[in-house]
């Protein structure tokens, strides 16, 4: 399964694409979409750049699923609202590209990638490098996006195991009655 991970941001949005085949993860691509070249007063243009950029990435890499980091509530409510709009542009673009969208918090991603939810950016970058066998450290935004994709791959494996267990329990449920085998 090919997974597109997104770390939304109004100035810089990270993206990461990984392939998950059973227990193996492989790196496909990563990078950022930047709106820094646009003026700070040009919010609609920035949102369009994010929307179009995500659509282009989805068309180029043809992911089977996507995952997006859930935003945190910042001390500054205006910053939270702006980040929410950027995230909305990204999610809308993913849905418009006919992709399912899973959502994970930064804490969930850090725990899945680095082993604990309070991992520093540098620790996430190092673990993403190791998990995907990259030659160098990815940038912070790309590393977070790759981490979100890795988290979704791990959750997908867990859900597949649960589905298999549920199916197995259905086949064996009818063979036992009142504690005795038929």
UniProtKB/Swiss-Prot annotation:
It is an enzyme of class 3 (hydrolase). Binds 2 Mg(2+) ion per subunit. GO terms for biological process: DNA recombination; DNA repair. The RuvA-RuvB-RuvC complex processes Holliday junction (HJ) DNA during genetic recombination and DNA repair. Endonuclease that resolves HJ intermediates. Cleaves cruciform DNA by making single-stranded nicks across the HJ at symmetrical positions within the homologous arms, yielding a 5'-phosphate and a 3'-hydroxyl group; requires a central core of homology in the junction. The consensus cleavage sequence is 5'-(A/T)TT(C/G)-3'. Cleavage occurs on the 3'-side of the TT dinucleotide at the point of strand exchange. It comes from Variovorax paradoxus (strain S110). InterPro entries: RNaseH-like_sf, RNaseH_sf, X-over_junc_endoDNase_Mg_BS, X-over_junc_endoDNase_RuvC. Keywords: Cytoplasm, DNA damage, DNA recombination, DNA repair, DNA-binding, Endonuclease, Hydrolase, Magnesium, Metal-binding, Nuclease. It catalyses: Endonucleolytic cleavage at a junction such as a reciprocal single-stranded crossover between two homologous DNA duplexes (Holliday junction). PANTHER family: CROSSOVER JUNCTION ENDODEOXYRIBONUCLEASE RUVC. This is Crossover junction endodeoxyribonuclease RuvC.
């Amino acid at each position: 399964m090919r997974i597109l991970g997104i770390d939304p941001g109004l100035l810089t949005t990270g993206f990461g694409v990984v392939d998950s085949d059973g227990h193996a993860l492989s790196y496909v691509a990563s990078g950022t979409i930047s709106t820094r070249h646009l003026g700070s007063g040009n919010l609609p243009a920035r949102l369009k750049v994010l929307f179009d950029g995500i659509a282009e990435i989805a068309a180029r890499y043809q992911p089977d699923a996507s995952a997006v980091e859930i935003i945190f509530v910042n001390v500054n409510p205006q910053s939270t609202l702006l980040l929410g709009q950027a995230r909305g542009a990204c999610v809308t673009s993913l849905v418009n590209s006919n992709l399912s969208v899973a959502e994970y918090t930064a804490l969930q991603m850090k725990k899945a990638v680095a082993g604990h939810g309070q991992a520093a950016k540098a620790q996430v970058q190092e673990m993403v490098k190791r998990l995907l066998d990259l030659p160098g450290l990815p940038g912070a935004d790309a590393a977070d996006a790759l981490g979100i994709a890795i988290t979704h791959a791990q959750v997908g494996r867990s859900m597949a195991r649960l589905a298999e267990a549920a199916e197995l329990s259905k086949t064996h449920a009818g063979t036992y009655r009142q504690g005795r085998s038929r």
